[in-house]
């Protein structure tokens, strides 16, 4: 029978000093036999996805204590990728994932907490906490702050919504010289109306949906908007549930409730199956690979490639379409609705466990609105946006008049009526990416699935932006942005500005972009990232020259630099001859801090999730 971890610091005469300090935090005599549960919050006023979380930790804590536990809250950092975008701040985004994972480990292990409720939301916070949960392997429930409502532009005549907007629309309009200042300002003011994670199928929402599929979050976690009153129930339930999980593990020796028991290889495969089916952000590939490594699960790019070849695209939301946002996915039945369709297509392992419903199959039976779910589920998925700008959680209770249960032409489709039988994400291989690269096929126009173009080579994102805005990129080009990988950046910047500017220049469907960096979940078009190995690790992307021919073939999962092997060998030899300057960007001016240098020293390429390789410390 496992012992409560907290007894290490709460029991025995030798812990009198520790108990004295615990008492100073408010604990009483009767609390020292209860489980101590860490409420891992991530409130910050810097990030709209986290600005409303200040009081939600206390909400969870009250439920924990009412259920017989002791709640102790702390905060992690949280970087807003949208605010950090387009300048040196983006270098810090991906490395913050490791910092978050480490800080959770430090706090939980230093204070011997028995379990956690992880209150996450935005891009690197959910992955960082997920990595920590796998690492610590103590009972945990994830509950996110929830998605932002989509922005709306309404008709001045009848007030009806004539367009839905998000952050990416604001960026594209601002860069389009044909858009007036007044129109650009209207979009800017309308794009992000409420608290919550940005409203499309971007990285934050993708990851919060995937925690449902993995089994560590409650139904609706990824889709019910942050402002809706019914989201409060997820936080309350999480507080009660984590105490139950604690008792099952520590008092009943039930290890099935532990993260590593739930997040098995089959669970990661289920999550990736969902990811491909819903066209999730390409960043999810990095984060699932990283979390799997922390869990000790052998889940690799080859598994992702295999899954991507057999799973159809069953759901589309912005940026893959301007018709639907996350609030529309919720109205169509949320993640359990997509999982229900995948289950009926025999594409899931329904025996995988979760924290709330026994097995995935049981959860689908209870929550899939097209699979016979009851009145409670039917009501829950009618939770709608309120249409009122606010930074306050649970501030409205609007409901949709009807559910979207149309699986032929609706937001969520069944397999027979899939958006495409080829899934929403794909892994490409070739001499430009021997270890793979990632493309979000859900966001690529079918006319570009096979594309050949001329290389336009840039040594940094900044140079690429200057080149695109300076009209140095033309239709038919393949923009190469290199030395932006985990080591080369360092930090593997997102390329939302280059992709947005290509669209603003009318090149979104006539150009491609290939990089060892990564993309915001808001990027779409023929944009291919995560080139592995990266340029700084000797990847062939570092040998591409201006004007080279690049061949892209998504149906056959191929990306190829049309240069002979002899020529490539000569280029590689010439690069090696540069000595210490080999595999380094030419004439790039970039200040790299000591913190980022430390990250770069241990970072791996994207095919391994850009995690740290601690074996390098032994060299």
Curated annotation (Swiss-Prot):
UniProt entry keywords in alphabetical sequence: 2Fe-2S, Amino-acid biosynthesis, Branched-chain amino acid biosynthesis, Iron, Iron-sulfur, Lyase, Magnesium, Metal-binding
InterPro entries recorded: Dihydro-acid_dehy_C, DihydroxyA_deHydtase, DiOHA_6PGluconate_deHydtase_CS, ILV_EDD_C, ILV_EDD_N, IlvD/EDD_N
Residues recorded as bearing N6-carboxylysine in the entry: 124
Swiss-Prot/TrEMBL cofactor(s): [2Fe-2S] cluster; Mg(2+)
EC numbers for this chain: 4.2.1.9
UniProt pathway annotation: Amino-acid biosynthesis; L-isoleucine biosynthesis; L-isoleucine from 2-oxobutanoate: step 3/4; Amino-acid biosynthesis; L-valine biosynthesis; L-valine from pyruvate: step 3/4
Pfam families: ILV_EDD_C (PF24877), ILVD_EDD_N (PF00920)
Domain of life (superkingdom): Bacteria
GO CC, alphabetical: cytosol
List of catalytic residues: 520 (proton acceptor)
Membership in a protein family: Belongs to the IlvD/Edd family.
Function summary: Functions in the biosynthesis of branched-chain amino acids. Catalyzes the dehydration of (2R,3R)-2,3-dihydroxy-3-methylpentanoate (2,3-dihydroxy-3-methylvalerate) into 2-oxo-3-methylpentanoate (2-oxo-3-methylvalerate) and of (2R)-2,3-dihydroxy-3-methylbutanoate (2,3-dihydroxyisovalerate) into 2-oxo-3-methylbutanoate (2-oxoisovalerate), the penultimate precursor to L-isoleucine and L-valine, respectively.
Protein name, UniProt field: Dihydroxy-acid dehydratase 1
Organism: Bordetella pertussis (strain Tohama I / ATCC BAA-589 / NCTC 13251)
Record gene name: ilvD1
């Amino acid at each position: 029978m496992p012992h409560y971890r907290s007894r290490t610091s709460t029991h025995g005469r030798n812990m009198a000093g520790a108990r004295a300090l615990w008492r100073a935090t408010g604990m009483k005599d009767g609390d020292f036999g209860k489980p101590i549960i860490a409420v891992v919050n991530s409130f910050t006023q810097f990030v709209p996805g986290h600005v409303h979380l200040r009081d939600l930790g206390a909400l969870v804590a009250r439920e924990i204590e009412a259920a017989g536990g002791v709640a102790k809250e702390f905060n992690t950092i949280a970087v807003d990728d949208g605010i950090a975008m387009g300048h040196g701040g983006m270098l810090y985004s991906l490395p913050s994932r490791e910092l978050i994972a480490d800080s959770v480990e430090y706090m939980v292990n230093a204070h011997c907490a028995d379990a956690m409720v992880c209150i996450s939301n935005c891009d690197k916070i959910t992955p960082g906490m997920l990595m920590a949960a796998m690492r610590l392997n103590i009972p945990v429930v994830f509950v996110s702050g929830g998605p932002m409502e989509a922005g709306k532009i309404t008709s001045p005549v009848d007030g009806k919504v004539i367009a839905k907007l998000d952050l990416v629309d604001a960026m594209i309009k601002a860069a389009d010289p044909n858009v007036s200042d007044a129109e650009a300002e209207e979009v800017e003011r309308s794009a992000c109306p409420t608290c919550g994670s940005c409203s499309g199928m971007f990285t934050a929402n993708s990851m919060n949906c995937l925690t449902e599929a993995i089994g560590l979050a409650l139904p609706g976690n990824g889709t019910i908007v942050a402002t809706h009153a019914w989201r409060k129930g997820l936080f309350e339930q999480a507080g009660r549930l984590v105490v139950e999980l604690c008792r099952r593990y520590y008092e009943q020796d039930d290890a099935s409730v532990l993260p590593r028991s739930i997040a098995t290889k089959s669970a990661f495969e289920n999550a990736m199956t969902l990811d491909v089916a819903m066209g999730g952000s390409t960043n999810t590939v990095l984060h699932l690979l990283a979390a799997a490594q922390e869990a000790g699960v052998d889940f690799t790019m080859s598994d992702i490639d295999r899954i991507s070849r057999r799973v159809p695209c069953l759901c589309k939301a912005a940026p893959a379409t301007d018709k639907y946002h996350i609030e529309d996915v919720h109205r169509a039945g949320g993640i359990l609705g997509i999982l229900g369709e995948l289950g009926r297509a025999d594409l899931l392992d329904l025996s995988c466990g979760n924290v709330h419903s026994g097995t995935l199959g049981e959860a689908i039976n209870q929550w899939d609105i097209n699979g016979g779910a009851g009145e409670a589920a039917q009501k829950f998925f009618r939770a709608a946006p309120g249409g009122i700008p606010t930074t306050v959680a649970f501030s409205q209770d609007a409901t949709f008049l009807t559910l979207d249960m149309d699986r032929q032409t609706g937001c969520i489709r069944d397999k027979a009526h899939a958006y495409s039988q080829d899934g929403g994400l794909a892994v490409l291989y070739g001499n430009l990416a021997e270890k793979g690269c990632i493309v979000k096929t859900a966001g690529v126009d079918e006319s570009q699935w096979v594309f050949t173009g001329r290389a336009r080579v840039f040594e940094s994102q900044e140079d690429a932006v200057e080149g695109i805005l300076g009209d140095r990129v033309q239709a038919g080009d393949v923009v190469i942005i290199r030395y932006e990988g985990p080591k080369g950046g360092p930090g593997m910047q997102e390329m939302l500005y280059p992709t947005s500017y290509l669209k603003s220049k009318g090149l979104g469907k006539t150009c491609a972009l290939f990089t060892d960096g990564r993309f915001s979940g808001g990027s779409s078009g023929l944009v291919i990232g995560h080139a592995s190995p990266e340029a700084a690790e000797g990847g062939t992307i570092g040998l591409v020259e201006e004007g080279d021919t690049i061949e892209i073939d998504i149906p056959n999962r191929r990306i190829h630099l049309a240069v002979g092997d002899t020529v490539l060998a000569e280029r590689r030899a010439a690069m090696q001859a540069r000595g210490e300057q080999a595999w380094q960007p030419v004439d790039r001016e970039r200040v790299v801090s000591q913190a980022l240098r430390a990250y770069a020293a241990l970072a791996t390429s994207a095919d391994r999730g850009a995690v740290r390789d601690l074996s390098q410390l032994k060299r």
